[in-house]
């Protein structure tokens, strides 16, 4: 991580915080139905229906109903997954604003349309398979925090795509002028000081997590990654070592860090996002509202978020992670394969072995 001279100031005094207990979130298979419909060469409509007998609100962020260029579907051609070129975002599941949710009465539906060519190169044309499955956090009734999550699996679409038409669809991620490793235009003043502190905190998290992964308590590793195999432990350790190196490098690195929303994709409740295809990491306004340092528990602080985002960056360690789940209670329900590829499992593990 290259840091311009304006960033070499001492970090602001860190605010210490204590984490609160995380609510238990139940997971179920019924309640929401998701259907995909092709409506154009590369355009898709998603319909979500509340099949429960009560009102339900679901999180829109990082789902088919997110207006940001997140991964809404998986695209494959001839058995191979088409690379995703959009953004991977981070939010604190226990502190989302009302607008992060969509409320549905019993039997009601909501629709969203999107163009899959905005975040994937489909210029090869031909037959593509489009699928979507995962888990959506929900609120049953009139609450303000998720009460559970619902697994879903939509129908699979087979779309015959005109490659020339697809190539004319504008990317959802605009090109930027070349920037320094830590962007000097957006990382100034207090932003620069706080980010410098977050990067130092990231080094501590990543170094201790690397040590714990390679030679620490096997039960603790099992808690977060659902395996104790040496191959998995060494792979996790290597990812953390690569992150520690990226966070500690003052003059060189593989990512570009923006302290403000240069792509204009932030929404209330979003903390940061990464564009792996560009090796760009962007902090949202809510990042700066987090405590710079949390000393106990598993709540996010600045360094926690940096670790989360850097696990997404394929330029730091490949393959990059995705976002199957957020928060301890959701992340611990993932299987081993999902846990090893989920960004928040890494941040949670790093926070646990460092703070507790």
From Swiss-Prot:
One of its GO terms (molecular function) is metal ion binding. Gene3D superfamilies: 2.60.40.2970, Collagenase (Catalytic Domain). Disulfide bonds join 187-259, 266-284. Keywords: Cleavage on pair of basic residues, Disulfide bond, Hydrolase, Metal-binding, Metalloprotease, Protease, Secreted, Signal, Virulence, Zinc, Zymogen. Its main location: secreted. InterPro entries: Fungal_M35_metalloproteases (IPR050414), Lys_MEP (IPR029463), MetalloPept_cat_dom_sf (IPR024079), Peptidase_M35 (IPR001384). Residues 1-19 form the signal peptide. One of its GO terms (cellular component) is extracellular region. Binds 1 zinc ion per subunit. It is found in: Secreted. GO terms for biological process: proteolysis. Zn(2+) binds at residues 308, 312, 323. The keyword Disulfide bond applies. Residues 20-179 form a propeptide. It catalyses: Preferential cleavage of bonds with hydrophobic residues in P1'. Also 3-Asn-|-Gln-4 and 8-Gly-|-Ser-9 bonds in insulin B chain. The active site is at residue 309. CDD domains: M35_deuterolysin_like. Its EC number is 3.4.24.39. Its cofactor is Zn(2+). Secreted metalloproteinase that allows assimilation of proteinaceous substrates. Shows high activities on basic nuclear substrates such as histone and protamine. May be involved in virulence. Belongs to the peptidase M35 family. This is Neutral protease 2 homolog MEP5. It comes from Coccidioides posadasii (strain C735). The gene is MEP5.
């Amino acid at each position: 991580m290259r840091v311009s001279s304006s960033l070499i100031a001492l970090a602001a005094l860190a605010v210490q915080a204590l984490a609160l207990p995380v609510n238990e979130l139940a997971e179920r298979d019924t309640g929401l139905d998701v259907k995909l419909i092709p409506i154009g060469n590369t355009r898709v409509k998603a319909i979500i229906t509340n099949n429960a007998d009560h009102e339900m609100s679901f999180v829109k962020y990082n789902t088919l109903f997110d207006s940001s260029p997140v991964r809404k579907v998986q695209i494959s051609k001839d058995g191979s997954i088409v690379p995703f070129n959009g953004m991977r975002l981070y939010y604190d599941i226990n502190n989302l604003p009302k607008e992060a949710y969509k409320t549905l009465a019993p039997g009601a539906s909501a629709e969203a349309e999107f163009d899959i060519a905005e975040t994937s190169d489909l210029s090869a044309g031909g037959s593509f398979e489009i699928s979507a499955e995962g888990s959506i956090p929900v609120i049953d009734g009139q609450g303000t925090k998720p009460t559970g999550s619902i697994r879903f699996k939509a129908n699979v679409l087979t779309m015959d795509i005109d490659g020339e038409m697809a190539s004319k669809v504008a990317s959802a991620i605009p090109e930027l002028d070349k920037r320094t490793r830590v962007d000097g235009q957006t990382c100034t003043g207090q932003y620069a000081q706080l980010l410098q502190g977050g990067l130092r905190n990231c080094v501590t998290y990543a170094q201790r997590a690397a040590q714990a992964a390679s030679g620490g308590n096997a039960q603790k590793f099992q808690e977060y990654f659902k395996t104790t195999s040496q191959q998995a432990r060494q792979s996790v350790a290597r990812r953390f070592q690569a992150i520690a190196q990226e966070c500690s490098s003052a003059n060189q690195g593989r990512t570009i860090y923006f302290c403000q929303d240069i792509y204009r994709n932030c929404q209330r409740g979003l903390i940061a996002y990464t564009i792996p295809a560009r090796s760009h990491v962007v902090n949202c306004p809510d990042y700066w509202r987090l405590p710079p340092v949390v000393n106990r528990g598993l709540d996010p602080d600045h360094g926690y978020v940096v670790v989360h985002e850097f696990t997404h960056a394929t330029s730091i360690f490949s393959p990059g992670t995705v976002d199957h789940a957020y928060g301890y209670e959701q992340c611990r329900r993932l299987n081993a394969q999902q846990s090893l590829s989920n960004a928040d499992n890494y941040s949670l593990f790093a926070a646990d072995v460092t703070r507790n």
